[in-house]
UniProtKB/Swiss-Prot annotation:
Alphabetized UniProt keyword annotations: Acyltransferase, Cytoplasm, Transferase
Cytoplasm listed as a keyword: yes
Effect of L24I: In allele NAT2*5L
Impact upon substituting Y208H: In allele NAT2*12F
Protein name: Arylamine N-acetyltransferase 2
Organism annotation: Homo sapiens (Human)
Primary gene name: NAT2
Superkingdom of source: Eukaryota
Cellular compartments annotated: Cytoplasm
Length: 290
């Protein structure tokens, strides 16, 4: 695996030598705008691989994306390779339809330490809950970013990540009640602890998410990619674009229902993905919002 190939994949041409917050932020922003958050392999009859070599080949050489266990593992490798003090952590996503956090450790995120300060780094949340900059590990502090206001809160060793969203203006009125729209302005995202993890801790969950009838990833095909102004999301046959803060502290959200031919075209032109296999789009159950 070649770190320069990774940097070329994400379009990063800046410093590799300064292990500071600016460099960390720059790398994160480049990755989330180049590497889609997606699970399309599952809906093409292929597996979501967990091995680092396979992930590197999939994302860097084949120009694909992945879910958190893949994109954050790749980011972990890149950051440690250039010298950042980086730790894997495990998280539990909030599930809006059932109003509780997942019982299993379904999320991989990173902690990076710079000059004695700890930051949460995550390239694998997707949609409008994706951070654009690292979050300082401080409890109770609002941390405004372009997508929203993020806030970390610690209670008895458990950290909770929440977001405060803007109002949203939906251009297509037939989608006003779409299950893809977040319903609350204050939204829970996930919880985590600071216990260091290894990728082996996620092996059984990686299998479970692809095989269990209760896994929302089986019922949902998704692909999302951040842009300088917003985020594209493809869920099943529905393409959305959310432009953050387009006016008056309001996000603009556009919906479009695609045909099978248009799905392939959108993947190629917007997400820069060529699958090479037949995709079976699935609409999901409301666990994933845009």
């Amino acid at each position: 695996m070649d770190i320069e190939a990774y940097f070329e994949r994400i379009g990063y041409k800046n410093s590799r030598n300064k292990l500071d917050l600016e460099t960390l932020t720059d790398i994160l922003e480049h990755q989330i705008r180049a590497v889609p958050f997606e699970n399309l392999n599952m809906h093409c009859g292929q597996a979501m691989e967990l091995g680092l070599e396979a992930i590197f080949d999939h994302i860097v050489r084949r120009n694909r994306g992945g879910w958190c266990l893949q994109v954050n593992q790749l980011l972990y490798w890149a950051l440690t390779t250039i010298g950042f003090q980086t730790t894997m952590l495990g998280g539990y996503f909030y599930i809006p339809p059932v109003n509780k956090y997942s019982t299993g450790m379904v999320h991989l995120l990173l902690q990076v330490t710079i000059d004695g300060r700890n930051y949460i780094v995550d390239a694998g949340s997707g949609s409008s809950s994706q951070m654009w900059q690292p979050l300082e590990l401080i409890s109770g502090k609002d941390q405004p970013q372009v997508p929203c206001i993020f806030c970390l809160t610690e209670e008895r060793g458990i950290w909770y990540l929440d977001q405060i969203r803007r109002e949203q203006y939906i251009t297509n009125k037939e989608f006003l009640n779409s299950h893809l729209l977040p319903k609350k302005k204050h939204q829970k995202i996930y919880l985590f602890t600071l216990e260091p993890r290894t990728i082996e801790d996620f092996e059984s969950m990686n299998t479970y998410l692809q095989t269990s009838p209760t896994s929302s990833f089986i019922t949902t095909s998704f692909c999302s990619l951040q842009t300088p102004e917003g985020v594209y999301c493809l869920v099943g046959f529905i393409l959305t674009y959310r432009k953050f803060n387009y006016k008056d502290n309001t996000d603009l959200v556009e919906f479009k229902t695609l045909t099978e031919e248009e799905v392939e075209e959108v993947l190629r032109n917007i997400f820069k993905i060529s699958l090479g296999r037949n995709l079976v789009p699935k609409p999901g159950d409301g666990s994933l919002t845009i």
